[in-house]
Amino acid sequence: MTTFSSAQEGDVPALGHLLALLFAQEQEFKPDAQAQCSGLTTIIRNPALGTILVARDKDKIVAMVNLLYTVSTALGERVATLEDMVVHPQCRGGGVGSALLRHAIQHCEDRGIKRITLLTDEVNDSAQRFYERVGFRRSTMVPMRLHLP
């Protein structure tokens, strides 16, 4: 039976492994265990920044999603950025990812969050279809990045 919960500090090694799998397939990011574990720990220790939700099969983490919080001046309300949605390859296709995503959406609704924004690789058509199936739509906004030293 799959259960959902917020990640704890003891989960960081398993989450880091999932992120390594995710970043190995993304164009813009590279696995860096130290950086990823530092980021995960920062979020877990600071719930005002965000929440990392996990799916567990028995005691093993099989999927994760990261929700980061801010305020939209356009809406005048709290909003979230959804990142790092990843399901272990051996567990894909069984509905775990869809269930975790629905759980994340409900988590946001329960906290009064009014919008969830996410980014996915431009060439990752299957991920885009996955998000569209639960109601996400393409935005006219174009993401841009400036990496600082």
Located regions from the model:
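Conserved acetyl-CoA-binding loop-helix of GNAT-fold acetyltransferases
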Residues: V87, G93-Q106, R129, R133
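Conserved GNAT acetyl-CoA-binding A-motif
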Residues: L101, C108-L119
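Conserved acetyl-CoA-binding loop of GNAT-fold acetyltransferases
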Residues: Y131-M141
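Conserved GNAT-fold acetyl-CoA-binding loop/helix
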Residues: H17-T42
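A short beta-loop-alpha structural element at the N-terminal edge
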Residues: T3-L15
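Conserved beta-strand-loop-alpha-helix junction that forms the acyl-donor binding cleft
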Residues: L118-A127, R145, P149
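Conserved beta-strand in the GNAT
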Residues: I52-V54, K60-Y69, T81, V86
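A conserved beta-turn-beta hairpin within the catalytic core of GNAT-like acetyltransferases
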Residues: K60, V71-L82, R92, S139
